[in-house]
Amino acid sequence: MYSASLVALLCLASAIQGLDLRSSEEQPCFDIPKPKSPILEMDWLFSVKPIYYPLMNTIDLYHASVDLLQKNARDVSTSSVYYDACLTWEMFSNGTIFSKGFNGLQREYISKAVEDNPDAFTMEPVDGEKDVYSGTAYTTLTDNKTFFVQAGCLPSGQMAWGVGTTTPTLPEETKKKIIEHVISLGFKKDDITELKYDTCKDIKV
């Protein structure tokens, strides 16, 4: 009984403790190969509303959540990120990007195309702290129908990646394909994490 209670307390403590951004770091930034020809159809991308965000590496999820909440990472619990984030995105042709989640919060970013790479763009918040979640994002894989994978370098000098989708969940075959792809880029399997939408209001899974 004692050991079971102790385990329960440890699990609870882990769930309510603040985020440790340093422990979520995967590896320093590295170069993303430029496609021989553009792979992302922008008209399709701008038509997807909302964009769900079910798969990414841990550091990306933590930074996106902290930036949306506008809080110190130590004041954001791990459990709130996985159960309350409900992250979605909207992207517009004028460069405006909105992240939404945590029961109605919204954060605005401005993006600019990278001249020599049509599958890349820079992004930073319109106001507030700019060194939490900004940088250059590169589209590395997409079917231009249901998902796209983007990777980039955070201001912390650490590499991040995430998957935008048209639905809250991904088919297993698609997920497998994406995981194989990000590993081939140099990311680590152990740092892959999933965001669940089961408990999100107004989102049908």
Q: What does each model-found stretch correspond to?
A:
Residues 2-205:
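A beta-rich soluble binding module of mature secreted/lumenal proteins
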